[in-house]
Amino acid sequence: MSTNNLDIKLNCNSSGQTIVTHQYTTHPLRLSGVFRLDTTDPRTAYLYLINTSPGLLAGDNLSLSLQLEKGTSVYLTDQAAIKVHAMPMTTTKANTNIKIKVEAGARLELVAEPIILFADAALEQTTYIQLHSRAELFWSEIILPGRLARGEWYEFRYYLSQLEITSMTEEICFRDAIHLEGKQNIFKHRDLFAAKPVLANLIVVQPHSDLEVLSQKLENLEAANCPDLLLGSSILPNNKGLLLRALASKTPQIKKYIKYALNCVRNLTNRSSLPYISK
């Protein structure tokens, strides 16, 4: 029996459509049914990850396993933002563990909704992605240092994220770690963080693509119509892909840019732009 809260496997049916062939769920995670939102691309399955709880609480330990078999194509997003609630006892925290495997010719677009770090929240997140050399990946996350609309800002305890991408033989392709302090952050009043508190991270892996050309497109903030965004990109070791980090004053700006970035990648591979994703 799976020890994960959500265990998903996807494969292609005889028509070439991506379907869910295995699904095991326990509270509080659920998976939506498959949506076919693009009539020009019946191969791609559009899925929502649903958390039926109010959010992450002290002591929560959520695990998700996602396996894409050969030739599958998946767009996965959350139904709503991930709220990390107060954990005033310094010995408590919440944990999330994500394990992903993407086989040859498969494609994963994982566009997460924002993680909102409430006052006194503490979250540790690990993401492990095993990627075939002929697999494609678009991965994004957004981090909010509080309920900004309420004036809550950097009152959380800490956020720790560790991400690792390996080959199918477990050779490390890329490793990244973010340790973001909240209350104890000595830089939170600096102009950079005060003016642009919304943080986003993006990873793009496109085999056999010209990463220099793609990087130039993704850094074109005029074309993205996001002139106020701060953005930096770098090519991953051994030309495995691209890492981008962005800062913005508001969440809609970041979401707008992520959509632009995903459409750039789609256009590069002769796919239609992202259809409307209802939330």
Curated annotation (Swiss-Prot):
Keywords: Chaperone, Cytoplasm, Nickel insertion
UniProt-annotated location(s): Cytoplasm
Source species, domain of life: Bacteria
The UniProt record lists the keyword Cytoplasm: yes
Family annotation (InterPro entries): UreD
Example of a GO cellular component annotation carried by this entry: cytoplasm
Keyword presence, Transmembrane: no
Broad class of the protein's primary localization: cytoplasm
One GO MF term attached to the UniProt entry: nickel cation binding
Family stated for the protein in its record: Belongs to the UreD family.
Protein role: Required for maturation of urease via the functional incorporation of the urease nickel metallocenter.
Quaternary context: UreD, UreF and UreG form a complex that acts as a GTP-hydrolysis-dependent molecular chaperone, activating the urease apoprotein by helping to assemble the nickel containing metallocenter of UreC. The UreE protein probably delivers the nickel.
Protein name according to UniProt: Urease accessory protein UreD
Originating organism: Trichodesmium erythraeum (strain IMS101)
Lineage summary: Bacteria, Bacillati, Cyanobacteriota, Cyanophyceae, Oscillatoriophycideae
